[in-house]
Amino acid sequence: MQIPVFEVRSDGRENLIGALIMAAYYDIPEVTVYFNNKLFRGNRTIKVDNSSLEAFESPNMLPIAHMDIDIKVNYDSIFRSPSVAPFVIHDRLCRNVGLLRIFPSISIENVRASLQPPTEGVVLQTFGAGNMPSHRTDIIDELKKAIDRGCLIINCSQCVRGQVDVQYLTGKILYDIGVIPGSDMTTEAALTKLSYVLSKDCWGLSKKKAMMVKNIRGELTVTQPKPLRDIEIVSQIARFLHLNTSHELEFLRHAILPQLLCHAADSGNVELLRALRENGANLSAIDYNGR
């Protein structure tokens, strides 16, 4: 809350009531933040204002729900676990992690000190889409030395919105030496994820690197490996209806995915189920009969 709950005029009561309603009546198995009539995914949320009722924001993802006269929930955006397993709490985090924010006049001594043992992981905050000055070969060399000794370095943008793109030359230089692209993770999420991944002693270095680019709990956006129109039946329907734009295909997706899921499950077509899940279909969704 921004205004204490004991004040006559407070946002605390509305935030508490809204949070309780969302938790009690909606199946959203996530850690979330409810504030000012919006429900955000926790690992996508940052605090952007300390003196406004619009205090929290999810810069790279729309809110999961919005509470107005009616409560609108974007069920497609809910991140559900792909498997059913007992609930386990992992209560250890690696503390040997840090932040290194790049700026034009940063000294090599500053960089070197941030990468020295016992540091095991660093979130590198770079410019724009994951870039840094290409002429600073001294920084590149220090980063490579740290990576070679097993330090995980994650490239995150200093910008609030957008994601790291390794297609740019200066961003590709970092990628080529082993810096892991952080996609559109917030700095806070990247640091927390790094602490979690590094604490898993049962994982080798390659597994830890792979987990940093994997979408574990909806903290980053992953490019879909198979476009929706590549599913044969969707492609045929789109052609028949002369649908071409992304908006039209998205509308088609919402219209037919429940039927496709039911058909695939009924016929035992595991390959189709897998393709539908890769394209964002919720295997726990209800059909048009509410089942």
Residue ranges of model-derived segments:
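Conserved ankyrin/ankyrin-like repeat signature
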Residues: 271-272
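Accessory alpha-helical/coil subdomains and C-terminal extensions
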Residues: 38-136, 211-258, 266-267, 288
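ATP/nucleoside-binding phosphotransfer catalytic cores, i.e., glycine-rich phosphate-binding loops
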Residues: 134-238
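Conserved hydrophobic site in ankyrin repeats
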Residues: 275-276
